[in-house]
Amino acid sequence: MAKDTELDRKFFTALGQRIQTLRKRRGYSQEDMISFGYTVRYWQRIEAGKPITLRTLLRICGILGTTAEAVVRGLGPEAVKRPVRR
C-alpha cells in the first residue's frame, strides 16, 4: 500500500509540473487562472502536486487547450520513478 501511495505522490507531482509547463507555454500566469475560477493558492497547490479529480483535470485541459490524454501521456509507473526533466 505504501508503494502505491508513493507512486500516487510522484504521479501528481509530475502531473502538476506538466500542467505548470503547459500554463506557461500558453502565456498564462497563476493570477490569470482567477478568471477561470481558481484561486492563485489552489493553482499553486495543483502545480505542487496536490491530487486532483478527473473533472478538475478535464477543466484544466479545456482552459489550456489540450486533452487529458496528452497531459498524462508518459506519466505511468515507469515515468514517475524517474525525475521529471525541465
Regions found by a protein language model. Give the residues of each.
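Short, charged recognition helix plus adjacent turn
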Residues: 1-10, 72-86
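DNA-binding alpha-helical recognition surfaces that contact promoter or target DNA
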Residues: 17, 21, 35, 45, ...
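Helix-turn-helix DNA-binding elements, focusing on the entry/boundary residues of the two helices
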Residues: 19, 29-30, 40, 54-57, ...
